[in-house]
Amino acid sequence: REALIRAAAVLEQGRVLAVKEASGFVLVALAASTDPLRRIRAFMGESHQPIPLMLSSPDALDAFTVISAKEREWVMQPMAPLVRAKIREGSLSLSDQMAPHGVHLDICLPGSGMFHLLMNLLNLPLAVISDMGHRLPYACNEKEALEVFEGLVDFMLISDLPILRSTPRTLIQQVGQDMQ
């Protein structure tokens, strides 16, 4: 519990957190904090891709996106996919670094116990970057993560569970009535 409270405090201070999941490490920052998102973008060498937005519950979706009933259904699937949805105009509480050149956000809900607990403490939108599409260097343990993310990550939230394999999130986008 203490580690979760400290991790939440790190995020509230506008810093970068690495969370160890069964699928690898995930970089996390508050979605409203521009400075850590700029640091993450500089680290990744990527300036245009949307950064995935994790929301605490389905009720929060409408505050940030214009989402269809079908997209809402997809985002609530057990596999916790990313769903590309149109940004709601006036979503001022998000940093412009979330989708600097686009009109869409990749949104998701917590897909693991660690993120459910973290979101329960914060109840704030999070920017979450995993190794989806090989956007992040791969680290299979804490020692490697410290080396790979040196100078970027301010705190690591880890568990004693091993990283089993790198499993990228599924990205779903509605095109007409179809899911792609």
Please annotate each region the language model reported:
Residues 1-180:
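Active-site-adjacent structural elements in enzyme catalytic cores
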